Curated annotation (Swiss-Prot):
GO terms for cellular component: cytosol. This is Uncharacterized tRNA/rRNA methyltransferase MG252 homolog. PANTHER family: 23S RRNA (GUANOSINE-2'-O-)-METHYLTRANSFERASE RLMB. Its EC number is 2.1.1.-. The keyword Endoplasmic reticulum does not apply. GO terms for biological process: methylation; RNA processing. Belongs to the class IV-like SAM-binding methyltransferase superfamily. RNA methyltransferase TrmH family. SMART domains: SpoU_sub_bind. The lineage of its organism: Bacteria, Bacillati, Mycoplasmatota, Mycoplasmoidales, Mycoplasmoidaceae. Pfam families: SpoU_methylase (PF00588), SpoU_sub_bind (PF08032). S-adenosyl-L-methionine binds at G198, I218, L227. InterPro entries: Alpha/beta_knot_MTases (IPR029028), Ribosomal_eL30-like_sf (IPR029064), rRNA_MeTrfase_TrmH (IPR004441), SpoU_MeTrfase (IPR001537), SpoU_subst-bd (IPR013123), tRNA_m1G_MTases_N (IPR029026). One of its GO terms (molecular function) is RNA binding. SUPFAM superfamilies: alpha/beta knot (SSF75217), L30e-like (SSF55315).
């Protein structure tokens, strides 16, 4: 299926409680005496935990807003397979998915996830390699929305596109290359669509562009070459919703 890194950190009690609400397995909880109120819940759940001093947290997680409460989880448990995503969307007459090609910046990844949640996207598909993993930065930037979304990690985006096309999805690729004659994104009128967006610097590769059913762009001031990828995703998704 898919493998991300084996561990990731959650910072703060809010993220911990969200993880419990979503029935995620927590490997260990590191906390200080200031979180005594949660110690009873931790013991009741039978979770492994360690008590640490404030100094320990500041040494281990320098420059991070750790709140003296850090959980260790396996992020792989948040992932679904492409088959599970198809099961979710097959019964829907309309559906929007987002597919990411090698997004490198975890802040961009997290911001995209947050936007996808707000825009009621049914699933986000991303690569196993050359892609920012789901880590503490992504979780924090997503404002915890990562826990509530259908996330699919694949080794081959082209295969995922072909599979989803067989289930009624049309692939809409973003590009800045005017030679490809991209249309205004507002002209898209597919009931089931995949928004395919590329790497922050290189965009989409030739194969993905070839496999796309339609190429689109965001009309903008000609003095501007491009937008931040997370901003572009937001503009298109909410443009489609309206």
């Amino acid at each position: 299926m898919k493998r991300m890194q084996e561990t990731s950190f959650l910072f703060g009690s809010k993220a911990f409680l969200e993880a419990l609400d979503n029935q995620l397995q927590i490997k260990k909880v590191n906390l200080s005496d200031k979180h005594q109120k949660l110690l009873g819940l931790i013991k009741k759940r039978g979770l492994r935990y360690e008590m640490h001093s404030s100094q320990w947290f500041h040494q281990q997680f320098r420059h991070i807003n750790h709140q003296e409460f850090v959980c260790v989880i396996n992020p792989n448990q948040m992932l679904k397979t492409i088959e599970q995503l198809i099961q979710i969307t097959d019964s829907k007459s309309t559906s929007t998915l987002v597919m990411l090609h090698e997004i490198q910046d975890p802040h961009n990844f997290g911001a995209i996830l947050r936007t996808c949640m707000a825009a009621e996207v049914d699933g986000i598909i991303f690569k196993k390699h050359n892609q920012a993993p789901i880590n503490s930065t992504v979780i924090r930037t997503s404002m915890g929305t990562v826990f509530y979304q259908n996330l699919v990690q694949v080794t081959n985006l082209s295969y995922a596109i072909t599979t989803l096309q067989k289930h009624g999805f049309w692939t809409v690729a973003t590009t800045l290359d005017e030679r490809l004659k991209p249309k205004d994104y507002r002209q898209v009128d597919f009931d089931k669509r995949i928004l395919l967006v590329g790497n922050e610097d290189k965009g989409l590769n030739a194969l993905l562009l070839k496999n796309a059913d339609l190429k689109v762009k965001i009309p903008m001031n000609p003095k501007l070459n491009s937008l931040n990828v997370s901003v572009a995703v937001g503009i298109i998704l909410f443009g489609w919703k309206s």
